[in-house]
Amino acid sequence: MIRLSQWIKACSLDQVKEGQLFGFHSDDKKILLANQKGKIFATDLICTHADADLSTGFLSDEGVRCPLHLSVFNLQDGKPQNLPAEIPLKTYNVKIEQDEIYVEV
Ligand code: FES
């Protein structure tokens, strides 16, 4: 089955202020939004190492740090910067239209 990507509306821009994380669910997808220095990134919400919700983690210049075992994931390519996580997070395209954030899933 071919699954075409589609843009889904995530939330309004003012729900993800600079330095903040925001998690949401859409059908079977669990997505994390992060506002790093005014730019919005979208990745999977659940850590690739175990079942940790990254929206309860910590955002820094390096990326998002998992709250459970503290791996940091780069927001552009999803790659873990330190163990124990070894598998990259999936990343998603983001667009902003009329102060609403959309993610391509
Ligand atoms: S659950 Fe995220 S690093 Fe272990």
Question: Model-flagged regions — what are they?
Answer:
Residues 47, 66-69:
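Short cysteine clusters
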